[in-house]
């Protein structure tokens, strides 16, 4: 259950970050900008609430490195949504993050 909450917190955080990115590229007035920023605040707030639940049951020294999942989620989403390039160095970094998270997460 803890790992699911950690993943959920990371996904909410990732979605909030993606809304912020989208807000920087929006044209067409103030309303779309405010919608993207509002979505970001809502998603980041949800991430915080889930994260507080995680911290009730998982040692912070174990839980905090799991937030590195955000690097993976944001990288993949940026590649998919905005066709951002993924260099070999960046891909290797993501792979190393996955390995580190797997090692840290093996406490359960």
Curated annotation (Swiss-Prot):
Record has 4Fe-4S as a keyword: no
Membrane topology recorded in Swiss-Prot or TrEMBL: Multi-pass membrane protein
Main location: membrane
Keywords: Cell inner membrane, Cell membrane, Lipid A biosynthesis, Lipid biosynthesis, Lipid metabolism, Lipopolysaccharide biosynthesis, Membrane, Transmembrane, Transmembrane helix, Transport
Gene Ontology biological process terms in this record: lipid A biosynthetic process; lipopolysaccharide biosynthetic process
Domain named EamA: residues: 34-106
Molecular function as annotated in GO: carbohydrate derivative transmembrane transporter activity
Pathway noted in the entry: Bacterial outer membrane biogenesis; lipopolysaccharide biosynthesis
Superkingdom of the source species: Bacteria
Protein localization: Cell inner membrane
GO CC terms: plasma membrane
Transmembrane intervals: 32-52, 58-78, 85-105
One family name in Pfam for this protein: EamA
Family: Belongs to the ArnE family.
Function: Translocates 4-amino-4-deoxy-L-arabinose-phosphoundecaprenol (alpha-L-Ara4N-phosphoundecaprenol) from the cytoplasmic to the periplasmic side of the inner membrane.
Subunit structure: Heterodimer of ArnE and ArnF.
Stated name of the protein: Probable 4-amino-4-deoxy-L-arabinose-phosphoundecaprenol flippase subunit ArnE
Organism listed in the record: Erwinia tasmaniensis (strain DSM 17950 / CFBP 7177 / CIP 109463 / NCPPB 4357 / Et1/99)
